Amino acid sequence: MVSTHVDIEQAEWTPGIPFYGPAARYDGKDIVQLKVLSDRRAEGGGIAWLAKFSPPRGKLIKIVATALSDEHVFNLEGGRATKSGAPARASGGYTLNPTGQPHSAMIAAETVSLIIYSGEPDQIVSMEVIDVAA
């Protein structure tokens, strides 16, 4: 097997719809975009990507999912938020959602995360854009 190398700066952001569903586009804009770094699922491995979440001004992205394999999330920029849009976790944080774990995220500011799955990516139960609570 050969090593995989990806020039992150040269890799293009692609729509997140194939993995996150049609709600990854809002008012004609891709609010979830991915740079797939590796996909070894066909060989029994996992998939890794950079994900960029870009909620519209005054809104937040709410995601509810179930981990179909161990999911490692490293927040590189931005982070999770409360319903009021206040930061709950800043960049530099790490989360492990083990296989079978239901979990959720609310994102109120542009966020970039490195997400690594040991197998299949999350099953997205729901994803919606909601108003930031006053």
Q: Which residues are covered by each model-predicted region?
A:
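A short, N-terminal "cap"/entry segment at the start of jelly-roll beta-barrel domains
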Residues: 1-47, 129-134
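Conserved short histidine dyad/triad with adjacent acidic residue
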Residues: 30-67, 86-88, 98-102
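Structural motif
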Residues: 46-48, 73, 110-112
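Residue-level recognition of well-ordered beta-strand positions that form the cores
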Residues: 50-52, 79, 116
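Short beta-strand segments in beta-sandwich/barrel cores
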Residues: 58-60, 73, 78-82, 94, ...
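Alpha/beta-hydrolase fold active-site loops
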Residues: 70
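Short conserved catalytic/interaction loops centered on acidic-Pro-aromatic/His motifs
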Residues: 84-91, 106-107
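Ligand-binding loop in jelly-roll beta-barrel domains
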Residues: 99-126
